Amino acid sequence: MRIGMICPYSFDVPGGVQSHVLQLAEVMRTRGHLVSVLAPASPHAALPDYFVSGGRAVPIPYNGSVARLRFGPATHRKVKKWLAHGDFDVLHLHEPNAPSLSMLALNIAEGPIVATFHTSTTKSLTLTVFQGILRPMHEKIVGRIAVSDLARRWQMEALGSDAVEIPNGVDVDSFASAARLDGYPRQGKTVLFLGRYDEPRKGMAVLLDALPKVVQRFPDVQLLIVGHGDADQLRGQAGRLAAHLRFLGQVDDAGKASAMRSADVYCAPNTGGESFGIVLVEAMAAGTAVVASDLDAFRRVLRDGEVGHLVPVDPPDLQAAALADGLIAVLENDVLRERYVAAGNAAVRRYDWSVVASQIMRVYETVAGSGAKVQVAS
């Protein structure tokens, strides 16, 4: 099968959707399918040979974050050319609601079109502005996928169409077998934070507020930080506790897996804006206990606290105290921590790419059943 995929977000910056698209493309290629991926990227970006750059991206506020997207007349021409020469059996768009390559392609293309919805926000200015345009455009989508129940419900409420729920995929074995970082496990406890720590919704401020109580209980605890942000600024905010912070910066997937394998607990103190907890799944696959905010998306992944510790986020002014208590409870109780690890190991199997890719392929086969090709609309 010839599969065209479009990622709206730039591959110059790591992100969950980018990782999902890259891994899905790789799995489909190993199964013998021909895949071409169109995505924003700068000229110096290191991309596989089956990637086509849609050009440099620009930062646009989206879903409580800053997404790096590509739009405009030149991009329109590039998308049209890519579609015309692709001879695709299926076109798979990711996040077609964002002002991006995906939205452009949905407007230009017709035929067997699949779309995956990753976000669940109901406060999108983009959606408000484009809703009248999006609804008729969405009628062109033959197969709809939502990565979570939240994303599916948002799709139904905002645009009036249903979707099949297929979660994000994880290469479970690669996380389970990853080598630990040099010097780990440490003599003391290690808590891992992963994400763009300069984005408020990722919850680093909450974690810093929780840290004094955790340090009081575990004086040798280390907060291992992976991701993008201003490390010097964060050290300044941590004050006298800055010595407990270790920064790894941005890492590749192998580095992420090693960091997760090296921690006693993975902490996700997010305050909102999440539709699926893919990083929680990765941590569980690595054999690391999870302490996470009690958000709908995280609660679903952690099975209401069965496979990880959930921390109340309301009232907000008490979230840091609750997070500190949760971290201490899991760090000091080896039996509880090992129970979470064992339960997580069993729970993540449904997210393995061997399962998820097969579910997506069934959607492809359904929409491409007529034999019609993806074409540029006349």
From Swiss-Prot:
Key words, A-Z: Cell membrane, Glycosyltransferase, Lipid biosynthesis, Lipid metabolism, Magnesium, Membrane, Phospholipid biosynthesis, Phospholipid metabolism, Transferase, Virulence
Gene (UniProt): pimA
Gene Ontology CC annotations of this record: plasma membrane
Pathway: Phospholipid metabolism; phosphatidylinositol metabolism
CDD domains: GT4_PimA-like (cd03801)
Residues marked Important for catalytic activity (site): 118
pH-dependence of activity, as noted: Optimum pH is about 7.
GO molecular function: GDP-Man:Man3GlcNAc2-PP-Dol alpha-1,2-mannosyltransferase activity; glycosyltransferase activity; magnesium ion binding; mannosyltransferase activity; phosphatidylinositol alpha-mannosyltransferase activity
Biological process, per Gene Ontology: glycolipid biosynthetic process; phosphatidylinositol metabolic process; phospholipid biosynthetic process
Enzyme class of the recorded protein, top EC level: transferase
Record SUPFAM superfamilies: UDP-Glycosyltransferase/glycogen phosphorylase
Main location: membrane
E.C. number: 2.4.1.345
The keyword Transferase is annotated on this UniProt entry: yes
Observed phenotype of the null mutant: Cells lacking this gene are unable to produce PIM and show an increase of phosphatidyl-myo-inositol (PI).
Cofactor entry: Mg(2+)
Membrane disposition: Peripheral membrane protein
PANTHER family: SULFOQUINOVOSYL TRANSFERASE SQD2 (PTHR45947:SF3)
Additional detail: Was identified as a high-confidence drug target.
Name this polypeptide is given: Phosphatidyl-myo-inositol mannosyltransferase
Self-association state and partner proteins as the record states: Monomer.
Binding site for GDP-alpha-D-mannose: 9, 16, 196, 201-202, 251-253, 256, 274-278, 282
Function: Involved in the biosynthesis of phosphatidyl-myo-inositol mannosides (PIM) which are early precursors in the biosynthesis of lipomannans (LM) and lipoarabinomannans (LAM). Catalyzes the addition of a mannosyl residue from GDP-D-mannose (GDP-Man) to the position 2 of the carrier lipid phosphatidyl-myo-inositol (PI) to generate a phosphatidyl-myo-inositol bearing an alpha-1,2-linked mannose residue (PIM1). PimA plays an essential role for growth in macrophages and during both the acute and chronic phases of infection.
Compartments, as annotated in UniProt: Cell membrane
Residues that, per the record, bind a 1,2-diacyl-sn-glycero-3-phospho-(1D-myo-inositol): 18, 62-63, 68
